From Swiss-Prot:
It is found in: Cytoplasm. Residues 1-41, 167-208 are annotated as: Disordered. GO terms for molecular function: ribosome binding; rRNA binding. The keyword Iron-sulfur does not apply. This is Dual-action ribosomal maturation protein DarP.
Length: 208
């Protein structure tokens, strides 16, 4: 399997525009399309089809697809044999090539929103992990966290930190560390929700 670069992780190939032309040379409309052009188009559409097949069921339902293509993708998800899956993906590729440019662009736009949401969730989890690591490493971080999240149960937080440190020292399973992660997650979620709840009143003030 090819290693995925940082750039390709953030901007997957299936989100790149699929440029399809009926001719090979703009200066000579009679020139047939080259093999390399056809290969690029086929590969781009295959990547798009593979990305669709890999979507969770709830997300796939949100993508604007012709019924025949949606049915083919659902069938591909049910196939377990390698050869059967390969043939089904070839069929999906054929259906993808029958789509209009507008159809493809609409699909790409929805997939781009999924990628954006996944990146935001990943960033949120990293923020939680960073807070947990800081809390375990530095008592000063506890004071900073409480100041940033005043609704935090201070005693419970300090107990979790103390127990997690002790577990690490004794080589025990990180039960308290996992509980600390959840506590930080809830605190950050509460902070975000408080910000959202404050927005309507700000809008009302602006409109007054």
């Amino acid at each position: 399997m090819r290693a995925m670069s940082r750039a390709s992780r953030h901007n997957p190939s299936y989100l790149q525009p699929v440029v399809r032309t009926d001719i090979g040379d703009e200066d000579d409309p009679g020139t047939p399309k080259s093999k390399s052009q056809r290969k690029r188009e086929v590969t781009a559409l295959q990547d798009l089809g593979t990305a669709l097949e890999a979507l969770p069921k709830d997300r796939l339902a949100k993508v604007p697809l012709p019924e025949t293509l949606a049915d083919a993708l659902r069938e591909a998800r049910r196939i377990t044999s390698h050869e059967g899956k390969r043939r089904q993906m070839q069929y999906i590729g054929k259906l993808m090539r029958a789509l209009t440019d507008d159809d493809i662009e609409a699909i790409r736009r929805v997939l781009a929103t999924f990628v954006g949401a996944s990146k935001a969730e990943t960033a949120r989890l990293h923020a939680i992990e960073r807070w947990r690591d800081r809390l375990l490493a530095d008592d000063g971080a506890i004071t900073e966290f409480i100041a940033a999240h005043p609704d935090t149960d201070v005693q419970a937080l300090r107990t979790l930190v103390r127990n997690a440190r002790k577990e690490a020292q004794l080589g025990k399973p990180p039960k308290s560390s996992r509980e600390l992660f959840q506590a930080v997650k809830q605190a950050l979620a509460g902070h975000d929700q408080a910000g959202e709840d404050a927005e309507p009143s700000n809008l009302e003030d602006d409109q007054a």
